Every structure is written in C-alpha cells, then in structure tokens.
UniProtKB/Swiss-Prot annotation:
Interacts with MEIG1. Interacts with TP53, MDM2 and SIRT1; the interactions mediate post-transcriptional modifications of TP53 by MDM2 and SIRT1. Keywords: Cytoplasmic vesicle, Repeat. Pfam families: MORN. Residues 76-100 are annotated as: Interaction with SIRT1. It is found in: Cytoplasmic vesicle, Secretory vesicle, Acrosome. One of its GO terms (cellular component) is acrosomal vesicle. This is MORN repeat-containing protein 3. Expressed in testis (at protein level). It comes from the Eukaryota. Assembles a suppression complex (suppresome) by tethering SIRT1 and MDM2 to regulate composite modifications of p53/TP53. Confers both deacetylation-mediated functional inactivation, by SIRT1, and ubiquitination-dependent degradation, by MDM2, of p53/TP53, promoting a proliferative and cell survival behaviors. May play a role in the regulation of spermatogenesis.
Amino acid sequence: MPVTKCPRKVEPPWKGWDRKAQKNGLRHQVFAVNGDHYVGEWKGNLKHGKGTQVWKKSGAVYEGDWKFGKRDGYGSLSHPDPETGKLRRVYSGWWKGDKKSGYGIQFFGPKEYYEGEWCNNQRSGWGRMYYNNGDIYEGQWQNDKPEGEGMLRLKNGNRYEGIWERGMKNGHGRFFHLDHGQLFEGYWVDNVAKCGTMIDFGRDEAPEPTQFPIPKVEILDPDGVLKEALDKLMKPEEEEG
C-alpha cells in the first residue's frame, strides 16, 4: 500500500522579509528614501520612545521623545547656523502631536528668546520674551502675540503695565517714565494713549527729570472729566444715518 506524504508547509520568502522589515525596539540607524535618518526606539513600525531624527534637506536635528511616529514629550530641535554650519539649538521643551505644546524655550537669535507656554506651535499662555534691543515682555500670550495682562520693560528702564490685545497696548494701563520721573495712567488703543492722567513719580531720583513739575489740576471735577472722556472713547456715538 503506497504511503502518502503531505508536503511540508514552507513560509513564503516575502513573509520573512516583511517580518525583518518591521521595526520594533532599538534600531541603530534607519534611512528614509529622501535621505533622512533616525536612530532610536520603534514600536509597530513607528518611531516610539527615545530617538534622534536628522533631516537631510534642512540639516535640522531633533533629539527626544516620540510617540507613534510624532514628536511627543520632551525634546530639543537644532538647526545648522547659516554662517558656521554648526548646529544651533532653536527649541528645548515639550511637544504634543509633532507640535510645540507646554513649557519650552525658543531661541530666535543670540540675544532674542522666549521662555514660557506653547500651544500648537504658538506662544500661548504665560511667557517671557527677551528682545534683541534689550526690551523684555512678561505676561500673557495668545496666537503668538501678547494678549491679556502683561508688562513691557524697555531697555532704558521705562515700563508699561496693563492690557494687551493683538500684540499692542489696548485697554487700561500705566506707563512709568522713570527716566523723566513721571507716570501716565489711562487708556490705550492700538499702542496709542488716548486719555488719562500724568503725574510726577520719583521725579527727584529720575536721571533726566522734566524742567518743571506737573502743575496742580485746577478744574472742579477732574475725575468726572476723565470719566466722560473715557466713556466717549469706550462707546463712540453712532453715526447719524
């Protein structure tokens, strides 16, 4: 009686190739078709865990946390300096879904940087900005601009404390002219002081005091006059139709 043998099941070669191509755990270096390369941890064929990504075209380098193929967690981004070619750190902080989110520091230049909160790659929340000209802004941000309460301290020591909107002084605020020994308190519209009061403030200690002190207000109801002017500014009369 003939003996029948069942053929041994052989795994197709492509299955082995596919299994070897699946990236999980630590890989020393993986290159993309465009020349980008990544060194670090993988999960389910996606960058996941700690890793370093280098973009060939821009030369940018990211070192930090990844989650399912996106920068997520804490990490640093560096770009090559256009003059020296050396890597220069441009951001260190938290990421979410491949975007800057949470607390982080962004370097715009050698002396210009921002430290504070981010949301979707924009400065949003509380933050402090150091400008190249020596000015410093500290306060609230929204959509990458000062928005809400904040203080701008100028290089010469003068400062504004008050409300900001769309990156400009808008609303109630106080401007300390410490170089001249005066204080203005009032209402701003798009960086222009519209109405308010000016008083002497630390005039005796000011480096460049005004020639004469501010005279006493002689009108009967200065507060009422100021309130009336402010009301008109806040609620302009409707144009006659």
